[in-house]
Amino acid sequence: VMAVEARIQMPNVTGTAAQGYWPAFWMLGAPFRGNYTNWPSLGEMDIMENVNGVNTVWATLHCGTSPGGPCNETTGLGGSTTCPDATCQSAFHVYRIEWDRSGASEQLRWSVDGVVYHIVNQGDVDATTWANATGHGFFIILNVAIGGSWPARPSGLTKSGIPMLVDYVSVYKSI
């Protein structure tokens, strides 16, 4: 089992002041570097995404072809949950993906503060799609975008300059 996790406090802004905010912690397949045209087949694992300051975290595997394809692109194979105990914006939370290759079938598991809320199994897509999306290295990305294809468009009420705070990023591998 390999796990990638980070302890993050999303930008502490909500309501109309958060319109357009899009913090994310994600991994993109290494074959993207130098090619830039092979998304989503090379795999993208969104460990944490949030939009517009709502108390929801999204997790998604992007793979296959776009639009449509075995991973329902451009949406991907995703799930969501609220942050436990305190909002995503008002406190630090641990966002994690576990990549379990220990069984006969591989599995990706997403959790927040130790609570699993989304699972994608190898059998959810065909073997070629899974191999193309997971059979290589990944690079980790942490970013905050303002605007884009998913969040609302920023308005005059959007408060700029609110940071995403990152306590740590770790990668673990079972021996």
Which functions belong to the PLM regions below?
Residues V1-I175:
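GH16 jelly-roll
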